[in-house]
Curated annotation (Swiss-Prot):
Misc remark: Although this enzyme belongs to the family of MTA phosphorylases based on sequence homology, it has been shown that conserved amino acid substitutions in the substrate binding pocket convert the substrate specificity of this enzyme from 6-aminopurines to 6-oxopurines.
GO cellular component: cytosol
NCBIfam families associated with the record: MTAP, PRK09136.1
Complexes and interactors: Homotrimer.
Any one GO molecular-function label of the UniProt entry: S-methyl-5-thioadenosine phosphorylase activity
Family recorded in the similarity comment: Belongs to the PNP/MTAP phosphorylase family. MTAP subfamily.
Purpose: Catalyzes the reversible phosphorylation of S-methyl-5'-thioinosine (MTI) to hypoxanthine and 5-methylthioribose-1-phosphate. Involved in the breakdown of S-methyl-5'-thioadenosine (MTA), a major by-product of polyamine biosynthesis. Catabolism of (MTA) occurs via deamination to MTI and phosphorolysis to hypoxanthine. Involved in quorum sensing.
Signal sequence segment: none
Name of protein: S-methyl-5'-thioinosine phosphorylase
EC number annotated for this UniProt entry: 2.4.2.44
Positions that bind phosphate: 10, 52-53, 186
Length: 245
């Protein structure tokens, strides 16, 4: 059975129900990961957990050490990665509280350390990234959502923006024209780094706010925090179902 790694995003800095066996403060050639890895059992299965933004939450999206995070998970024995991401909803179907398992992404970030193939290396590898998410792992998430009867979208295009600010109305209009359904700040370079390490990777996205211009008012942190509070239980249900399967 594969050893799953779960990367928890905003609202999931710890995995309730994880029977912790050890905390691993792993050092990597790229520095320290966001937090010590947690190894334990969840839903009867060995799992690794990492809080993407640190525990407590202290790293904004553009300052997360994505290279160290993925490297540490690989070194600790991860064989597949499920990433949990809080996102804004662009498409009308992506209302607050909706869950999405995206099948594609577009990267709008800049200036992030986005590859392991940099510096003094012996050869460059051009990974195929046509389909950024691992399809069998995506299907595991979708099957769990269906079995639980949770409202979800089994496809979607994830726009990854630089942050940490939220987007303008005009920027969201552009993202929508580009074909994006949801918008977040942490999907890249995480997905590409996982591919470079040959780690199957899929995303479970929780919509926590309508994107700019998609509601009458402005977006507030209170609104986002309430949506996280209301929705994170569903995320845990899905993770438990996948791991128990």
């Amino acid at each position: 059975m594969s050893v799953y790694a779960i990367i928890g995003g905003t609202g999931l800095t710890q995995l309730e129900g994880l029977t912790l066996s050890e905390s691993l403060p792993i050092e990597t050639p790229y520095g320290a990961p966001s937090a010590p890895l947690q190894r334990g059992r969840y839903a009867g299965r060995e799992v690794l957990f990492l809080a993407r933004h640190g525990h407590p939450h202290r790293f904004p999206p553009h300052q997360v050490n994505y290279r160290a995070n993925l490297w540490a998970l690989k070194q600790a024995g991860a064989e597949a990665v499920i990433a949990v991401n809080a996102v804004g909803g662009i498409h009308a179907a992506m209302g607050t509280g909706h869950l999405c398992v995206p099948h594609q992404l577009i990267d709008y970030t800049s200036g992030r350390e986005h590859t392991y193939f940099a510096g003094d290396i012996e050869h460059v590898t051009h990974i195929d990234f046509s389909h950024p998410y691992d399809e069998p792992l995506r299907q595991r998430l979708i099957e769990a959502l269906r079995a639980l009867g949770l409202a979800h979208s089994s496809h979607g295009v994830y726009a990854c923006t630089q942050g940490p600010r939220l987007e303008t109305v005009a920027e969201i209009a552009r993202l929508e024209r580009d074909g994006n359904d949801i918008v977040g700040m942490t999907g890249m370079p995480e997905a590409a780094l996982a591919r470079e390490l040959d780690l199957p990777y899929a995303c479970l996205a929780l919509v926590v706010n309508p994107a700019a211009g998609k509601s009458a008012g402005i977006i507030t942190m209170a609104e986002i925090e309430q949506a996280l509070h209301d929705g994170i239980g569903k995320v845990r249900e899905v993770l438990a179902r996948v791991l128990a399967g």
